[in-house]
């Protein structure tokens, strides 16, 4: 096979007159009465190849037999296209290759869908024939971007003196929040490894080992319910460092992300990124990962409406809840009564018992609850919400967490529905000052808001076991366009604090030792103050590429039900394999 001289997509006017050898796939073939035109595609793009009997009758005859997705080698000369033949849609549109030779390297069956951008095909079929889906230019470009992003992270961390150190995939199952993927041990029947949800404990042990600055681009595994921005296996940019403050770790993170955006998108991001406390984010946006590209902020109107004779509002306030509102500016005419009823159904998915609303018309409140507002209260409400004619006011009244969840989700929906979001903007945000614990209603106890190795604020350590609700964490999340793209913290590095943390989470000293004894012992050997962050590579690429599903950024992803249509994983294994592992499967009962 002759060596390629150029990629198809690289050819331009500087190559005119040059002889080239190209390898690629036939994107399209057109027979125009004696001339055959082939669009030849490789990973760098498409170029038009012309087969003319005046140049090579033999090449024309072979070209007549090729079909879409045949793999070919073409030798020819680059020519300028005529002015009327220039194709501005192609990067190579000012040139074409006049073919002298063509060799068919392999044929192709007719693909199950056209290999081109914008093709209307189901996700299931795309994933079943993922190797064909990935040939499409838009998919190819996503993985070019992913490579650029990964390379930029590596280069930056290397320049900052971080060591790339691998941690094991076969490790111990420890309670970190989501379910573990378990791997049975053949050598020790009845015992299991776990695939890591993160390298959290191991990277902390690398700080105990004195490596000072560690990073890893690492695959992680979580057996959890899936959604558009989650996959059972995903990739993190994972880093840990000793003797630095959280502000210094955040500065390193900002430097990396600024470089990544510049390399991947040629956009300059200003530093430092804006900051917001967890409390402020929940109060203003109803979310711990707010999209700050648009307004529609939540406003607390409990004081304004507490004396209004509307039982829904009164009951919520009397029971320790609150009433908050969103002012959708100039949106009153966008929503019919039917549309507003649909919004009520939407917020019910987040626990809200309903959605009250008002419209402002000619300076007056209009809507089902307008009758409960006397003139003075109506004026006070409009002033509090800066409401004007044409505005739509939307209210939720309940416990604070339900109000936040329902109005936060509604805010995001309205931002899209009202076209308030600049899709070209990249809005980074730090969310800081997190509570160390959050209350789990189902479990009836406090659990870690992040993970059980997060350092409490020093002044709150005495309250770990006595008043968990007031303990704050040295934790920080990085948010981009409403997605959490990373989370980090300073870590507990003293044994007595870690023991107290485990007790606060309901571990007995014995169970803590059984699960984490190796970590507890390491903390007795001079573990330094340390901290770090983990950034979601797949999610960062998803946002930068303008996609809305992680599947598009992972070469061979799973479906929403954790199935791989390409390989049909997960699948059954043989009885012999199970016997070797001393395992039996439980058969489902059939009615």
Curated annotation (Swiss-Prot):
One of its GO terms (molecular function) is transferase activity. ATP binds at residues 222-224, 231, 484, 536-539. It catalyses: tRNA(Asp) + L-aspartate + ATP = L-aspartyl-tRNA(Asp) + AMP + diphosphate. GO terms for cellular component: cytoplasm. Gene3D superfamilies: Bira Bifunctional Protein, Domain 2 (3.30.930.10), GAD-like domain (3.30.1360.30), Nucleic acid-binding proteins (2.40.50.140). The lineage of its organism: Bacteria, Bacillati, Bacillota, Bacilli, Bacillales. Residues 200-203 are annotated as: Aspartate. This is Aspartate--tRNA ligase.
């Amino acid at each position: 096979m002759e060596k390629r001289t150029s990629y198809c997509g690289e050819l331009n006017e500087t190559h005119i007159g040059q002889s080239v050898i190209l390898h690629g796939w036939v994107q399209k073939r057109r027979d125009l009465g004696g001339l055959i035109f082939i669009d030849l595609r490789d990973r760098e793009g498409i170029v038009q190849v012309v087969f003319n009997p005046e140049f090579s009758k033999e090449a024309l005859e072979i070209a007549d037999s090729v079909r879409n997705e045949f793999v070919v080698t073409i030798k020819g000369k680059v020519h300028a296209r005529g002015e009327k033949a220039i194709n501005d849609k192609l990067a190579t549109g000012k040139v074409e290759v006049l073919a002298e030779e063509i060799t068919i390297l392999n044929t192709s069956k007719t693909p199950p869908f056209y290999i081109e951008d914008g093709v209307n095909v189901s996700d299931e079929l795309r994933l079943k024939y993922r190797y064909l889906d990935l040939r499409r230019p838009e998919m190819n470009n996503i993985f070019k971007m992913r490579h650029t992003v990964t390379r930029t992270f590596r280069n930056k961390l290397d320049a900052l003196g971080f060591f790339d150190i691998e941690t094991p995939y076969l490790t111990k199952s420890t309670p970190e929040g989501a379910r573990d993927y378990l791997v049975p041990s053949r050598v020790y029947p009845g015992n299991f490894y776990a695939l890591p949800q993160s390298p959290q404990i191991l990277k902390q042990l690398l700080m105990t080992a004195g490596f000072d600055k560690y990073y890893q681009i690492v695959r992680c595994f979580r057996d959890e319910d899936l959604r558009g921005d989650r996959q059972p296996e995903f990739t993190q940019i994972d880093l840990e460092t000793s003797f630095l403050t959280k502000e210094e770790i955040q500065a390193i993170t900002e430097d990396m992300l600024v470089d990544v955006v510049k390399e991947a998108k040629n956009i300059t991001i200003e530093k430092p990124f804006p900051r917001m406390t967890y409390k402020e984010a929940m109060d203003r946006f109803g979310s711990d990962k707010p999209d700050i590209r648009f307004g529609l902020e939540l406003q607390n109107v409990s004081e304004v409406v507490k004396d209004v004779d509307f039982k829904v509002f009164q009951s919520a306030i009397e029971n320790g809840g609150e009433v908050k509102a969103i002012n959708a500016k100039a949106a009153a005419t966008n929503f019919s009564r039917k549309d507003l009823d649909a919004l009520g159904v939407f917020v019910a998915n987040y626990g809200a018992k309903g959605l009250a609303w008002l419209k402002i018309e000619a300076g007056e409140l209009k809507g089902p609850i307008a009758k409960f507002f006397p003139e003075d209260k109506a004026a006070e409400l409009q002033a509090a919400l800066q409401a004007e004619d044409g505005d739509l006011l939307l209210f939720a009244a309940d416990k604070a967490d339900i109000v936040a969840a329902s109005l936060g989700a509604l805010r995001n929906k309205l931002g899209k529905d009202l076209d308030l979001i600049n899709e070209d903007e990249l809005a980074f945000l730090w969310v800081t000052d997190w509570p160390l614990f959050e209350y789990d209603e189902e479990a009836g106890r406090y659990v870690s808001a992040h993970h059980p190795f997060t350092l409490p604020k020093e002044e709150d350590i005495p309250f770990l076991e006595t008043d968990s609700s007031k303990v704050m964490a040295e934790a920080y999340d990085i948010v981009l366009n409403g997605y959490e793209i990373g989370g980090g913290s300073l870590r507990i590095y003293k044994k007595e604090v870690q023991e107290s943390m485990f007790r606060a989470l309901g571990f007995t000293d014995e169970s803590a030792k059984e699960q984490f004894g190796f970590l507890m012992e390491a903390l007795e050997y001079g573990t330094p103050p340390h901290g770090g962050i983990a950034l979601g590579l797949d999610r960062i690429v998803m946002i930068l590429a303008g996609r809305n599903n992680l599947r598009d950024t992972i070469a061979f992803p799973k479906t929403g039900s954790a199935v791989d249509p390409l390989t049909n994983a997960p699948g059954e294994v043989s009885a012999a394999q199970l016997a070797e592992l001393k395992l039996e499967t439980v058969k489902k009962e059939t009615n």
